[in-house]
Design a protein with these regions (language model features):
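Short Gly/Thr/Asp-enriched flexible loops that form oxyanion-binding sites at enzyme active sites
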Residues: 89-111
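Short acidic/histidine-rich motifs immediately flanking catalytic phosphotransfer sites
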Residues: 82-84
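Short, glycine-/small-residue-rich phosphate/pyrophosphate-handling segment
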Residues: 123-154
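Conserved small/polar residues in nucleotide/adenosyl-binding loops
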Residues: 156-163
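N-terminal glycine-rich anion-binding loop in soluble enzyme alpha/beta folds
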Residues: 2-78
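Short, ordered loop/turn segments at secondary-structure junctions
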Residues: 13-15, 91-92, 118-121
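Proline/glycine-rich low-complexity loops and linkers
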Residues: 112-128
Length: 167
């Protein structure tokens, strides 16, 4: 008997990782996560059921505040029974602050919450966004979360409350 496919919820709050270049203007615009597989075809190899939620208005992470942290936590709480793991896509400026706040807001979870961002948009040919997203999805799909607390991912796995920003 085969195990069921992991169900992962991506929560896009804002940040470069969720942007794509507008070919007409060359400016960045929010990525349409309905086309995630088209832009990151490697995700097919993961064999996960992936859904997403996008903030109605993506937040520049330098403007994120406790109300946004509550919104992220609420999305996780409302979807906790439906999914096996959660990936929060976030701007890198304040990702460490959000990760730390969520580690206290979401104590004692039995499912992984992974927070990641990137320096380059997800749709670029050579980007840390693709690697960070795929790594975050793989960790979120693990059946044995790391101490049940949120983690930040950017090539290195860090416990959320141990992260810091160089701002």
């Amino acid at each position: 008997m085969s195990e069921k496919r992991p169900r992962i919820l991506i929560i896009y709050t804002g940040g470069t990782i969720g942007m794509i270049e507008d070919p007409a203007t060359g400016t960045l615009k929010p990525f349409d996560f309905n086309h995630l597989i088209d832009n990151v075809p490697k995700i097919r190899m993961l064999d996960y059921d992936i859904e997403h939620i996008q903030f109605e208005h993506p937040i520049d992470s330098s403007d994120i505040n406790p109300a946004h942290w509550e919104q992220i936590a609420r999305h996780i709480g409302q979807n906790y029974e439906k999914f096996d793991g959660f990936v929060v896509l976030h701007g890198t400026d304040t990702m460490a602050f959000t990760a730390s706040a969520l580690s206290f807001m979401l104590e004692n979870l039995s499912k992984p919450v992974i927070i990641t961002g990137s320096q380059l948009p997800i749709g670029e040919v050579r980007t840390d966004g693709e690697e960070n997203l795929i790594t975050a999805l793989q960790i979120a799909a693990e059946r044995d979360p790391v101490n049940g607390e949120p983690m930040a991912v950017s090539y290195t796995h860090l416990r959320a409350h141990e992260t810091r920003s160089n701002l």
